[in-house]
């Protein structure tokens, strides 16, 4: 195994910086707590008592004199004219929030992972080491793993709630996305060029000789079926994870547009960010993407706007730009969520009757206490898509367009199936066979198909969930 050298030094340096600088310099903390976001403070009990005309009894004798052996909960009219004060969201306020430390660590790790990837790409572009392991792949894989962990952490909240409404919604969407994932896999490559068919063909071509040596010819179709079923199950679980982030995104998108009525440029960015999953779906729809740019239907003269390699590079760049665009409009979305406290109070004032003062305070505080969860719901799909894009470029053998794309080896298993010396023991021979089997399975074409499927499917789930969220908040939430 080749020595990592410079890449290992950069990895150790990055890990040290991430550990040492976290208390002093944090992108996640700056994104949420730099003072540009403001939150609403709940009205104090004294203010609510003054509005209700019920001053607090000064002592036990006064309560007994008024016939109150035990003080009843304070209730005020729902339309009481109290005001909600605002204050900047600071780090001191955020440290007590649930999941803030998880949010900070996850986002900062994703930032450092991106920095390692940029250095590695520059290192390979300038020096081109052929025998070194690309350590940025491990950073991206770790980030994808932590993204799934964040999805599990947030989704567990809905399954642990006493009310089963959120749990039912997750299970319903999981079943729906399971059906859609199975339908997507039967779409022809001429329509949806995810690359699953060439990837499976490459895998089976390399696995077939290995299975024949063991007499396991029957396992080849079973392996293909298992991979397709596994991709469908992964799509179902991912769809369940993205259900409530999509619903939340629709709500914050509507509110952010309302808050930015006098800023047309910001509204344009919000619309573009919201429709970014639709652009991602378009990138892999061959008739209206690759074929249209390769042979545009303009006049009788046939010409090509982009070559296949240029289209692949442009697709990678567009994916990165769309992820950065969604990151750029994070604060308008978070501010729109924090303003839900005021909207809930205004909705309360349109109702008749009385309400306990404690419930008013809880309605306001609950919005602020949930802001880190909303931040994770917004940023985790973005980070997952971005790192899958980086993995697609590296493991799929693509290029950024700044240099020639690396050539894909047609038979990677042939290199791993090198003759083993007679002096080597049985353990080394078994390890070599396992390495050959893995090399035949994880071919660049197969990884292209799997990663493209994950990127496309993540965008599809986000789009469907957010569109349903728009319909829900527009027509059903107020009814």
Swiss-Prot record:
What single Pfam family name could you report for this chain, choosing any that match?
Tmemb_161AB
User: Does the record carry Lipoprotein as a key word?
Assistant: no
Extracellular-side segments = 29-98, 156-166, 246-263, 326-370, 471-479
Q: Which segment of the chain is annotated as a signal peptide?
A: 1-28
Which positions, given as ranges, span the membrane?
99-119, 135-155, 167-187, 225-245, 264-284, 305-325, 371-391, 450-470
Where, per the database record, does this protein carry Phosphoserine?
69
Q: Which coarse location class applies to the principal site listed for this UniProt protein? A: membrane
Keywords of this entry:
Glycoprotein, Membrane, Phosphoprotein, Signal, Transmembrane, Transmembrane helix
> Its topology with respect to the membrane?
Multi-pass membrane protein
Which residues are exposed on the Cytoplasmic face of the membrane?
A: 120-134, 188-224, 285-304, 392-449
Highest taxon above the source species: Eukaryota
Q: Subcellular localization, per the record?
A: Membrane
Query: What upregulates it?
Result: Up-regulated in cells which display transient adaptation to mild oxidative stress by treatment with diethylmaleate, a glutathione-depleting agent. Also induced by retinoic acid.
List, alphabetically, the InterPro entries matched. Transmembrane_161A/B
* Glycan attachment sites: 34
GO cellular component: a single term: membrane
Q: Which GO annotations describe the biological process of this protein?
A: cellular response to oxidative stress; cellular response to UV; negative regulation of intrinsic apoptotic signaling pathway in response to DNA damage; positive regulation of DNA repair; response to retinoic acid
Question: What function is annotated for this protein?
Answer: May play a role in protection against oxidative stress. Overexpression leads to reduced levels of oxidant-induced DNA damage and apoptosis.
Q: What family does the entry list?
A: Belongs to the TMEM161 family.
- In its UniProt entry, what is this protein called? Transmembrane protein 161A
Organism for this UniProt entry:
Homo sapiens
Taxonomic lineage: Eukaryota, Metazoa, Chordata, Craniata, Vertebrata
The gene name reads: TMEM161A
